[in-house]
Regions:
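Active-/binding-site microenvironments in catalytic and ligand-binding cores
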Residues: 1-192
């Protein structure tokens, strides 16, 4: 609330008592990987097409991003390749809190009416955006990125993707499913 971090508890705490918080690191890191990857992807879409990210949802299984314009379907795999190149480059993210003067002159995605201290997250060469979310320190920590689906949606484009450990789990599941179908038809995976 304001500039203070507030934790809600299931029961009152005595003033002066010692408390211990526990962070679910696997969940946090998963969110960091996928959220940072969303920045890279949305930033590259914005650079190439000038489309805005107008919707974002982090489901436990995948991420959905809605864009303000129609991304050509033939460009989807090229964008995926560019995101994976950015991951491979292990780019250092930059977090800054620019002064109001500097912020007014700064180019960044999602310029909304912002007041007070504004946190800018930059993935050099990919994205610069006002954001209060959690991120990895280096793009290489994301691991991998895979677009699952892209479709026209409300005059724009909806893209579903996975990154990091979610992408590895998705790939593992797909390999197992292909192996089942391959065995069912007594065919090599590349022949089904």
């Amino acid at each position: 609330i304001g500039s203070e971090v507030v934790h809600y508890t299931d029961k009152p705490l005595e003033v002066g008592s010692t408390v211990t918080g526990k962070l679910d690191w696997d969940r946090r890191f998963d969110n960091m990987q996928n959220h940072t990857c969303e920045h890279i992807f949305s930033g590259l879409v914005h650079q190439k097409y000038k489309f805005e990210n107008v919707g974002f949802h982090m489901d436990p299984d995948d991420i959905t991003v809605d864009f303000s314009g129609e991304i050509p379907m033939e460009a989807i795999s090229e964008l995926e390749k560019l995101v994976n190149q950015a991951i491979t480059q292990n780019i250092d993210l930059k977090i800054e809190f620019p002064s109001e003067e500097v912020l007014q002159a700064m180019e960044y995605r999602s310029k909304k009416e912002l007041h007070g201290v504004v946190r800018i997250v930059t993935v050099p060469g990919c994205d610069r955006c006002a954001c209060c979310g959690t991120h990895v320190r280096h793009s290489g920590e994301i691991g991998m990125f895979k677009i699952l689906d892209a479709s026209k949606h409300r005059g724009g484009t909806r893209v579903r993707f996975v990154a990091g450990e979610r992408a590895r789990r998705d790939y593992d599941w797909r390999v197992k499913e292909i192996a089942k179908v391959s065995a069912l038809f007594s065919a090599k995976p590349n022949e089904i």
